Amino acid sequence: MSSYSRAERAPWGDFPKVVRNGDLGSLTNEPEYQAAKQGDAEAALNLVERLISDDTVAQLKTLIGDDKPRIVPVLAVEAAGNNKIPAMMAVVLADRLGLEVETDIVQREKVARTGAGSDHRLAFNPTFEGEVIPGQKYIVVDDTLTMGGTIASLRGYIENNGGKVMAASVMTAHEGALDLAVKPKMLAGINEKHGPAMDAFWKETFGYGIDRLTQGEAGHLRAAPSVDAIRDRIAAARNEAVNRVGASRTATTARAGQQQSPAVKQSSGNSGEDLLQAAQEAETEQQALLESAPIEQTYQQTLALYVQAKHDQVERIEDRLEQLVDRQQARLQQLQSNAPGLLSLPRTKAAWQQQQAQQQARLQTLHTRLDMVREIKEGMGIHAPKIEELATRKMRADDPELAGDWDSMREAARRHQALMRKQEQEKKQAQERERGRSQSLGLSNKPS
């Protein structure tokens, strides 16, 4: 049984596609974006009011008809601050649709999903609290849709507590991610590859079955080589989150160390000066990491676009090859039904046998290609890199500047971690030297 709080999910039913206002990643270059993500309500209102389109409003009007749902924003605490974009999106939509905003339902904990990778998103889905009015209809709104887990979890909380979520809308999303509900073909693919073990693991770990996942979430399960691989990825993501908390606390301690009195610094000798210098360097590195947050968000959001596009491409190729296999099998059956009789000329039989061999070879070639495509889709086989790897290569080739910024940011993060480890080691060494001096003083002051 997991010790982590569990998000809620509900059966999908006929839940409609999410209404998006713009393309994934389109907000990050807006002048108000960073301030809005960090808690500036005025910046968020200006951003949303300027960008919300008439088409978005019209689509929502069509979905709700004459109903009067309450608009509930994802009120989340981001790593950079209190994200105000969903709240202001709710305000603007409520004004244009003649509806009311629901502010009693809030996210219970901070999961910092903006810019996070897929494993973190699978491992940490937000939970919510607040009064749900039984029988009341709602519209869920958020700033960004990536895999859809946040919207699915908020919808689950509302529906499991007696409400009804009619629709969802976001400022930005990839077009291929708008149909949240996991498709029967996806579930069949997971069960075919992993059997019932994946569903059992998910129920044990998260409290709901794979049929309540989003299509984007389920795709990662289908692509995994095994249930154990997914289990390890979830555990690694949770361990990484714990380590981040520890690193944050270490950085806080380092900053506090800069406030020690001159007398204390002097008593520490050169080791104290070294620690102070290290702490100051850590502060600089920490600031650089904070400033690099937009790079991480842009990189992850852009990569999500490429991954989805690559998934779509592989799906199209698979469907096309399946059609070609079916046609080739039909041709072969037709050819076999027209086999020469016993009294046919030898040359007629030879020509038929040659034609049959050619058609069988063609069918075998198509099967081989189909197997290769499926291996790529599932991330299996020695010649089948994962779709994520293929998407990453293409994205980095298409946008070398973003790739360079990402690499620089990752290098800064590695330097920061190394500095933190060095500082901790020097602190321990200073403490050991201090203990040694204390013991020496104690011995020298002993009466003879």
Curated annotation (Swiss-Prot):
Keywords: Plasmid. The keyword Cell inner membrane does not apply. InterPro entries: KfrC-like_dom (IPR050043), PRibTrfase_dom (IPR000836), PRTase-like (IPR029057). Residues 421-437 have a biased composition (Basic and acidic residues). CDD domains: PRTases_typeI (cd06223). Residues 246-261 have a biased composition (Low complexity). Residues 262-271, 438-448 have a biased composition (Polar residues). To H.influenzae HI_1407. This is Protein TraN.
